[in-house]
From Swiss-Prot:
Record localization: Nucleus
Name of the gene encoding the protein in the UniProt record: RVR1
Changes seen on gene knockout: Precocious accumulation of VRN1 associated with reduced levels of the repressive chromatin modification H3K27me3 at VRN1 locus (similar to vernalized cv. Bd21-3 plants), thus leading to vernalization mimick and VRN1-dependent rapid flowering without cold exposure in daylengths longer than 12 hours. Global transcriptome equivalent to vernalized plants.
Ranges for domain BAH: 157-275
Organism: Brachypodium distachyon (Purple false brome)
Protein name listed in UniProt: Protein REPRESSOR OF VERNALIZATION 1
Tissue-wise expression: Expressed constitutively.
Listed Pfam families: BAH, TFIIS_M
InterPro entries in the cross-refs: BAH_dom, BAH_sf, TFIIS_cen_dom, TFIIS_cen_dom_sf
CDD domains in the record: BAH_plant_3
Record field: compositional bias (Basic and acidic residues): 71-86, 333-346, 499-512, 613-627
Amino acid sequence: MGRRRRFTQQSTSDDDDDKAAAEPPKTAKPAVPSSSGAKKQPRRHADEEEDEDEEDELELEDEEDDEKDLEEMRRNEEEERREETRTRRRRGRKPKRAVEESDEEPEEKKAESDEEEEEEVREEDSTEAVPVGDPVKVTGKGKKQRKHYASFEYEGNTFELEDPVLLTPEQKNEKPYVAIIKDITEYDGSLSVTGQWFYRPEEADKKGGGNWTASDTRELFYSFHIDDVPAESVMHKCVVHFIPLNKKIPSRKEHPGFIVQKVYDTVAKKLWNLTDKDYEDNKQHEIDLLVKKTMDRIGELPDREPTDTPGDNTDQFPNKRGLRKRPMNPIDVSRDATGKSEHFVKPETPGSDNLKHYAILAKFKVLTTATYRDKWLDKLLDTIPLTSNEGAGAAHADPVSVAKISNNGSSALDTSSVDNENSYAPDVVVSIMASLEKSTYDSLGSDFQKYNQKMRKLEFNIKNSPVLRTRLMNKELDPPVLLTMSPAELKAGLTPAEKTSEPEESRRLQMTDARCERCTEKKVGISDIIHAGHGDRYQLECISCGHTWFSSRDAISSLTVDAPSTGGNVGTAPWATAKFDVLQKQLASPRDQPDNKPGTDALQKSTAPSMPKLEKQKSFTKPKPEEPSAPTLEKQISFTKSKLDEPFVPTTLIKQKSFPKPKSQEPSARSADHE
């Protein structure tokens, strides 16, 4: 029976069937002796039939058990395959080919396994980033060749240039990175993305240590840091709003997304305002473009009051100037109200906030919703005299001024005509000042301190510079031009182009015989004298090369005057020569000379020393009581006068020159006596 069970179980081969057919006669031999074989023949057949029935039942049971075992094995194999594919998908590895199944596996299950393999291949293909379209440019050659694309596709999503995206962080506990796609490159078969990074406040380091605290959970810091990452690290797109500091932040429900109001300097580790105008030209254009895109997407945002503007949390210094004091109402201390203008609005007027020209500003509809802007408009309007104010002042003039005007007559008419020329119509003044304030607010409105400083500077220069005020009112200067002018240019009332084109005024310099240290030319003059405690210092300037330096008084030996090219020679006139002599003596010993001496005194003083010297020489060389003849004395006087044109000579040298002359006359006198 054991052999027959084994035969029924292994019925898959034809050779086994042949062997099994030959085996039954061997096992069918009777075990009893031959003597009793004939009697028990029918009984044996009955027993064999019963045994065969039992064996058939057992074989059926065994076959059913075997089929159950096979089905269970197949289920286990399918579960193992599915688990393996799941783990491979999570790890991102390519799945292995399915193990070949036996011939007994049904065709339906084979088809299902083929479909699963195709899906796995599709999923594997979708995990790789693929560029879209042709490359926009190619850089490098050979192995270093790089292809640049405008977009790429990854996991069914398409990403383009300038798209803000989230990137996979390095650590699982970190938040996703945020960047703007600036370039898409393919190198050596792999696709990479160049991103310009954003920083979260808790990720940005301070210069002195630590991190910044976020004013909003959505806040990010913009930066100019650029780095390359694999294209597969891109998760999905996001929205970033660039909001100036003077605008209110939109609500999270209406406009979800990140908020950027600061720029993080990764090198200096400092923060800058988004709307500062101190960036480089290309970076400034980039920031302005991002702000413009935000405004086009979400619309115009309402202004934020300066007191609500968050202070700069940079580590540069504590911003004490940002704490503005509440302005106090001006107190009127005048005894009478006769000289007041009729346009001055009372403090109890609603909405005026003590503006002097509130009625004019309201009439021409230039008032803004911001109080501080209206105050600056009122101050600018107060710098220009208005024709209506002039008439009002004349109507409310006091009797004393009227009496003075009647007594002066024509002089009063002249002054009134000058005032009328300098006064302007209110509509002209209001339009110009409103344009000036608006241009200042558009450029510096995000920073209240810079706006306040610029308005104070403009108000001061317009009030104190008649040239600037006249040119501005005559529309020779546009209001936006005043924002680019320096304090010196505002004071002169000239633009940079006009100031450079203006010819320089010729200067008269006291020239010296010193030599320039740079060009070694003898064209050095004194441009300035600095009076110090121990001695005067002289600032010398070379006319040839423009080099300037400081020197002591000892370095100056002689002085001349550098006259303009159009004038004549200054040293030819006798009085000018006398003045130069005085200057020489003053420079030689400035403390010995009196302050105010006319030129005639200097001439007499220069000629006086020669006379007593001649008398001393006469008395010293006089052998007899005879005096020198008149012609000799006249020659000596003319000789000393002619020396005025020469440089200053010490007195000892004059004595030596005048000493030999009386000696030349002594032999002639003695010879006359002998004769």
